[in-house]
């Protein structure tokens, strides 16, 4: 399929790619054609920022689509790189691990299946599941109150009969 890639400064080019190409590969092609360093590129399709580790088909980019390129200024790039550790996307690292244990075609197929399964599972997550996960993680996290806060709360609220019974039980246990 052919894609039209437009720079905001007016330059444009047409590139022949497949839907299975990664966004990182498209950036490489744009870099060669329009002389824009990959690190400075932000690719947009229908207002959505394209992530390097995803494929064009993940964004439903079809033939004759138009991709916009936004260039990040060099000063911002230098600041961004200074504050971020250099890490590679999970899928790239996983691909390297798979390449050590499988033939190239098999590693690519396994990686594709893993990505597809991951995306499908993400689509199935409901708000209720996310809330359950958050509650579980918060329950595991030890809650530490600043010293003296409990005493202040106890003095501030009126004592109920339940509070009185708890105090009596605590005194009896001692």
Swiss-Prot record:
Keyword Transferase: no
Keywords: Cytoplasm
Residue ranges of coiled coil: none
Cited Gene3D superfamilies: Phosphatidylinositol 3-kinase Catalytic Subunit, Chain A, domain 1
Sequence ranges of Basic and acidic residues compositional bias: 141-156
Pfam families: Tugs (PF17840), ubiquitin (PF00240)
BP GO terms, sorted: positive regulation of protein targeting to mitochondrion
Keyword GTP-binding: no
Protein name: Ubiquitin-like protein 4B
Source organism of the structure: Homo sapiens (Human)
Lineage: Eukaryota, Metazoa, Chordata, Craniata, Vertebrata
Name of the gene this protein is made from: UBL4B
């Amino acid at each position: 399929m052919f894609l039209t890639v437009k720079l905001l400064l007016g330059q444009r080019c047409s590139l022949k790619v497949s839907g299975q190409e990664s966004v990182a590969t498209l950036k490489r092609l744009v870099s060669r054609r329009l002389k824009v360093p990959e690190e400075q590129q932000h690719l947009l399709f229908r207002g959505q920022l394209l992530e390097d580790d995803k494929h064009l088909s993940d964004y439903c980019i079809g033939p004759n689509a138009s991709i916009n390129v936004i260039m990040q200024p060099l000063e911002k790039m230098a600041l961004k790189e200074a504050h971020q550790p250099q890490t590679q996307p999970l899928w790239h690292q996983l691909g390297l691990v798979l390449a050590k244990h499988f033939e190239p075609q098999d590693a690519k197929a396994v990686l594709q299946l893993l990505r597809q399964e991951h995306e499908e599972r993400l689509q199935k997550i409901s708000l209720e599941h996310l809330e359950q996960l958050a509650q579980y993680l918060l329950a595991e996290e030890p809650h530490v109150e600043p010293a003296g806060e409990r005493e202040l709360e106890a003095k501030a609220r009126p004592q109920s009969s339940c509070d009185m019974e708890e105090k009596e039980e605590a005194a009896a246990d001692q």
